[in-house]
Amino acid sequence: AYRDASSSPVPVMMAFEGVGPTSFYPEDWKCYGFDQNAEAAAEMFSVMTGKEVTAEMFGTAEYDELVKDASALLWVNEDTVPTVMAYGQHDKFQPYEGSVRLDKALTENGVPHEYIVLPHSGHGLQNDNRLYAEYMAKVEEYLNKYMSE
């Protein structure tokens, strides 16, 4: 939604997601050890993006441009649509650390958003029933607010 909102043939008014891809910075993928092994990070991110990534690219503008299509974080600006998002703090599939970075970018750009962290859950958002219900209520609230205009 962030990448295509301005060019979509259907108006994108808001986004909601649970445990969606956020960023491809090795330091956000500690659970895989990618913060300690740049070569392994480059191999995995090559598979995930379908583009050749090398360890030497990390931290460069070239790298950001290469992974931009797959990284929600790199599309955030002041025109980003309002967002509701939920992440499990113990997620090993889409590491939680990237969601912290996405929340910060949305905040810094003044994007209306709700960031719900489920502290006992992994990728399935399965161990925090009250917070999951809060997430679903926020999705409904945002749908009513932004989709009824």
Would you name each region that the model predicts?
Residues L131-E149:
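Catalytic active-site module of serine/aspartate enzymes centered on a nucleophile-bearing elbow/loop
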Residues P21, Q89-K92, H120-G122:
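Acidic beta-to-alpha connecting loop that harbors the catalytic carboxylate
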Residues T107-H123:
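Catalytic histidine neighborhood in serine/cysteine hydrolases
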Residues S121-Y132:
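Catalytic histidine-centered segment of alpha/beta-hydrolase-like enzymes
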Residues D79, M85-Y87, D91:
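Short beta-strand/loop motif that positions the catalytic acidic residue
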Residues W29-W75:
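Mobile cap/lid helix-loop segments that gate and shape the active-site cleft of serine hydrolases
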Residues K92-V100:
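Conserved alpha/beta-hydrolase "acid-adjacent" motif
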Residues A1-Y32:
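Primarily recognizes the serine-hydrolase "nucleophile elbow" in alpha/beta-hydrolase
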